[in-house]
Amino acid sequence: MKGLVVILSILSSFLTNLETKTLQSDFTITISEEVNAPMNFPGKILIQGDKFCLEMMDIKAAYNGKTMYMYTSQTDELTLTNPTEQELLEANPFRYAKALVDVCNITEKASQDGKQTIITLTPKDQSIGINRFVLQVRNEDLMPMKAEIKEGKKISSLKMKEPKYVSGEQQFEIVPEKSTFVNDMRL
């Protein structure tokens, strides 16, 4: 068991890496509730700071720090919005670590193999909307391996598959084809 100062240092280093580097990974999101069987959704993600690109099934989403792009291939429609903080949290679960670090009780434990650290953030005030945020990082490089959010009876789990940091300039927007219907809902 590490002390609180060490845990906060790990979280700080992890968040600094996400701000200064570009993380790329395939992933699987698992949504489970007490009543229903778990649902799994594979996808790909690219994250740098608050910016991200996300692909899941027939949906692509991107955020460039100002505009949210949401493309649905089934309807060939691109929607542009100014997202709310809640929408950004739902699209990029690592934002929870940043948003909750100052308002949570923080605990830590080692994974079974000892190669990863599991950090649990439990809000001191349950009016925040979530019951628990769990972040699992690889010890050698603080690479995120898993994030889990518990909201009431629902658990959303994001499991990374071979995450890595990539170099070079990345595009965090979706450029529509000429035939794509663009729905600009920005204020």
Regions inferred by a protein language model and the residue ranges of each:
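Flexible, processing/modification-adjacent segments and terminal tails
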Residues: I7-Q24, P38, T67-N131, R186
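Residue-level detector of beta-strand structural context in well-folded domains
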Residues: G43, F52, I59, C104, ...
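Non-transmembrane domains of secretory- and envelope-associated proteins
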Residues: D113, K124-N131, N139-L187
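N-terminal leader/targeting segments and the immediate start of mature chains
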Residues: M1-M39, L46-K51, P176-L187
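Short beta-strand segments that buttress and anchor functional surface loops
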Residues: F27-I29, C53-M57, I118-D125, K146-K150
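Short, surface-exposed coil-to-beta transition loops
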Residues: P38-P42, M56-M57, N64-G65, I128-F133, ...
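An acidic-aromatic
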Residues: K44-A91, E151-S156
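Short beta-strand micro-motifs enriched in acidic
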Residues: L46-Q48, K109-S111, Q136-E140
